[in-house]
Amino acid sequence: MLDLKFIRDNLELVRENIKNRGLKLELDLLISFDDERRKLITKIGELNALRNENANAMKDNIDDSSRHYLIEKGKALKAEIMDLEERLGYLTSRLLVEHKRIPNISAPDVPVGVSEDENVVLKVSGNIPKFDFKPKDHLEIGIHLDLFDFEKAREVSGNKFYYLKNEAVFLELAMINFAFSKLKAKGFDLFITPDVAREFIVDGIGFNPRGAESNIYKIEDTDKYLVGTAEITLGGYYYNTILDLKSPLKMAGLSHCFRKEAGAAGQFSKGLYRVHQFSKVEMFCFCRSEDSDRIHNEFLELEEEIFTELEIPYRVLNVCSSDLGAPAYKKYDIEAWMPGRGENGDYGEVTSTSNCTDYQSRRLKIRYKEDGQNKFVHMINGTAIASTRTLIAILENFQDAKGGVRIPKSLVKYTGFDYISPKN
């Protein structure tokens, strides 16, 4: 979250940022809570000073009448302090709720927009394949090649679940190994993270764990949630820690990701594109404030490198203000070309990377020492590989007229085969 002093000192900037993000928040309510809280803290301090004076006066050699008066005065002061502290506790909790709703300040070069249609294309890379046949979408390809089964998954688990089968199993594992090998060579520490996180960690990362708008699953009768991304478990790894940040601390984590995807429907959400469970390799970095823009750009370069080596055409987007998550200062999306998307093919999101500055670290109390002072770290996240959407892009871009699919050269050493043959 933002520093409260920063909010008070920059009210118009914060107000404009809220407007640009398409949010309706009661900033004045936050300030009124803080004003009253400050007054209460001052008043409680004054009353405690009076109570101490009263207690010291009772140590003097005084008559019974004066002692009785001081005792009653002490009781009255104690009762008043308790009442004010109860009010202070209530105000502090209300203040925290409103405070957490305030999004991060957006970077100066974030485009202002009201929908994802106003995301700005920064770069287009790769050659869109030209087929001498009508290309199939990944659903047709996968069913024909016996790579996944949605019907059985619907019976067993419900809508938006799937079984991966046969070569698709090797292909998913190959993508994960490919990403991990690349990130290990780039100096990342590798993790397989828990698929469950406590509520205060989920909340600290900036995911809203409660309410109808929540996109993650709560485990009943616990304070735990299934994670929607390893960003949650990697970001929480150093909760309440003071780090020795001689250099940026880079981590890469594999997790299953669970999403409710409530209300998601339509042709662009079919098949593997929007599902309740998938695997993802996530990149994460804890760094000093002066390094975060550079690391953010490095994460984008890594994502581009991955999709270039997978031979998948893509474009890079500078995400507009209303499409930013609350923690993000700036965000890039990569969209891969998917020939089976829509009538004539279209781009679909496959990765993103966000610089969240110190928004998450303030909630999670993750700091570093500099010149004898504790400062909040900056936190950057990014997708290396999201299994399902990358699988879509591979199946659709590398299909051939015979109904088979070529495997990208960079994955062959991990799959052990270079072609998925049509089934008779």
Curated annotation (Swiss-Prot):
Keywords associated with the record: Aminoacyl-tRNA synthetase, ATP-binding, Cytoplasm, Ligase, Nucleotide-binding, Protein biosynthesis
CDD domains: SerRS_core
PROSITE patterns noted in UniProt: AA_TRNA_LIGASE_II
SUPFAM superfamilies documented for this protein: Class II aaRS and biotin synthetases, tRNA-binding arm
InterPro entries given in the database record: aa-tRNA-synt_IIb, aa-tRNA-synth_II, aa-tRNA-synth_II/BPL/LPL, Ser-tRNA-ligase_type_1, Ser-tRNA-synth_1_N, SerRS_1_N_sf, SerRS_core, tRNA-bd_arm
Gene3D superfamilies named in the record: Bira Bifunctional Protein, Domain 2 (3.30.930.10), Serine-tRNA synthetase, tRNA binding domain (1.10.287.40)
Gene Ontology CC: one annotated term: cytoplasm
Presence of keyword Zinc: no
Chief localization: cytoplasm
Enzymatic class: ligase
Domain of life of the source: Bacteria
Catalysed reactions, semicolon-separated: tRNA(Ser) + L-serine + ATP = L-seryl-tRNA(Ser) + AMP + diphosphate + H(+); tRNA(Sec) + L-serine + ATP = L-seryl-tRNA(Sec) + AMP + diphosphate + H(+)
A GO MF label: serine-tRNA ligase activity
Residues that bind L-serine: T229, A230, E231, E282, T383
Cellular location(s): Cytoplasm
UniProt cross-references to HAMAP family, sorted A to Z: Ser_tRNA_synth_type1
Family: Belongs to the class-II aminoacyl-tRNA synthetase family. Type-1 seryl-tRNA synthetase subfamily.
PANTHER family: SERYL-TRNA SYNTHETASE
Biological role stated in the UniProt entry: Catalyzes the attachment of serine to tRNA(Ser). Is also able to aminoacylate tRNA(Sec) with serine, to form the misacylated tRNA L-seryl-tRNA(Sec), which will be further converted into selenocysteinyl-tRNA(Sec).
Subunit organization: Homodimer. The tRNA molecule binds across the dimer.
Protein name: Serine--tRNA ligase
Organism expressing this protein natively: Borrelia duttonii (strain Ly)
